[in-house]
Amino acid sequence: MIETSKRSRIINKINNVVISDYKGAIFVWGPKSTGKYTTIKHVLESNSRIYCEADCNEHYSTASLFRSLLSTLRNINKFGRRKPINYDDDDEYINNDINKDNEEDNNNNNNNNNNNNNNNNNNNNNNNNNNNDGYDDGYDDDYDYKDKSLNERIELLKINDLSKEFNNMIIKSQIYSKKIPATSIPSVSEMVQVLYEKASTNETISIILRHSEKLMKFEGEFFYSLFKIEEFTDHPVCLYLLSEIPTERILSTGKEFKPIRNIHFPQYEPNEICSIVLNFKPNFSIINYNQNNNDSNNSNNNNNNNNHLKLKEEDNIKLYNKLVELVVRVFHTTTRDIIDIIFVCHNLFPNYIEPIYNGTCGVEDSDSILYQNIESKIVKSLRNITEKDEIVLEDQKRQQETYQIYPPQQVPQQQKQQEKEKEKEKGRQLASYSDAKNIPYHMKIVLISCFLASSFSRNKDKLLYTKEAVKRQSLSNEKTTGSKWFHFQRAREIGYKLFPSEKKALFQESIFKSLASLKYLETISSIEPAFTYKFKCTRRVHLEFIKQISASINFKIDTYLEAAQFQIISK
């Protein structure tokens, strides 16, 4: 586990929770690929704790969720090795019988090691005589057990012991499967009791649930009951609810629930990503070996003996550090997944150092020559990361259909222009998707309130944001115009009404200025105070972009867009 300055504080928090044997639920939230699951798993395994895990995105009922928790229950040895908990830990009489049989087998082996070779020779002679006498090689029921050799007896004893263990495991698995049938809906207390029966321990069991926001779709009030898990059971249980959305956005505001402990994982900064990726360096010796083999093959084919440079390990480390910094600068706006960045760096490094092997540039030369060698591959890797698999498959099918109808040289010009326009639209959609994914949570709230303030006039504020019953009628012909100018104070009031649980400190002047610097908002410069400033949403803040932002924080913006089609009936 790689620790940074911010992660060390979070690890200390989780470590204190584990050491103090905390009982209850803990909500762990943060953006995607911030190390929530790996950090908790690392702390539990380092402290040798019993835990089980499940991904709520893969289950649609409590029965299937409880089955996956039961199958993933893990115990940690004193040596730090992870092992599954066996069903046969409680059956002492079977283990004692097996141990006794093993001791007898070991004694027989130690006493009769010198006679085994003689017995094997005698058996071979007897088998030859039996074959000559017409004896059948197949299994005979009348064949006496005493006439067998010691090795055959030992093998039969081991087979019998294994059959006992196998039968016992089948019986135990049937018992546990009867406790949680697929058709029933077990309660939380029943599930915890089954986990402790399987683990046969009095220590705390940790339960990790990823994508816990999906539990809101389960039957009944199951998600709210998890907050009171320590009240339902007498066994010590610590529940980790992992999500990318804060608790205030998941839970409904009308219900009362117990305040839950929160642990926030902030997003990785570019320097933190570099420090993590640099710990996963490729094998430089294999890369050098492959480069030398390719150079030798080319020299044999062309009859040229060029003097290729041999890089030292220090030079490889310096060049890899430069490549990682370059890749992180290019990729951190689209993705911050560390696994993707490591994969890209390992694939690009042999091509990155190819000009140095060829002798076209040195180790300490400018990076422009090295970057030109991998520029096309960086663009391809960016497309592979940002584009979804469905879009790639649709493009392949469309290209195959066009090439079957028209040869590559006879494609009409109109079709080429349409393809270029479609590619531009896809690029805009992908850019907006990446922007919506990387914007922080508090800026998303401000952008939603600014979009509503810029799209609709002040006359509709009472219709959209009031909680009182208002008479309204539909508009048959409504003229849709572009974004309008709005005051800072109006956007702040809309944000207070849409997100009452959030702190008022979020809607400050600094956030609006930062959005204006990022070209999400336009401003009118003035010497007056901030609350008299006027703002307007730019073209980057369009409807699809706002829908993606609202979906990421579980905010239903369609209800406000549908309500805007009406008008208040004047009394």
Swiss-Prot record:
Q: Which domain of life is it from?
A: Eukaryota
Single GO biological process annotation from the record: DNA replication initiation
Q: Where is the composition biased (Basic and acidic residues)?
A: 417-428
- InterPro entries listed in its UniProt record: ORC5, ORC5_C, ORC5_lid, P-loop_NTPase
Q: Which UniProt keywords apply?
A: DNA replication, DNA-binding, Nucleus
Q: Which GO terms describe its molecular function?
A: DNA replication origin binding
Q: Which PANTHER family match?
A: ORIGIN RECOGNITION COMPLEX SUBUNIT 5 (PTHR12705:SF0)
Q: What does this protein do?
A: Component of the origin recognition complex (ORC) that binds origins of replication. DNA-binding is ATP-dependent, however specific DNA sequences that define origins of replication have not been identified so far. ORC is required to assemble the pre-replication complex necessary to initiate DNA replication.
Task: Tell me the protein family, please.
Answer: Belongs to the ORC1 family.
Q: What is this protein called?
A: Origin recognition complex subunit 5
* Species: Dictyostelium discoideum
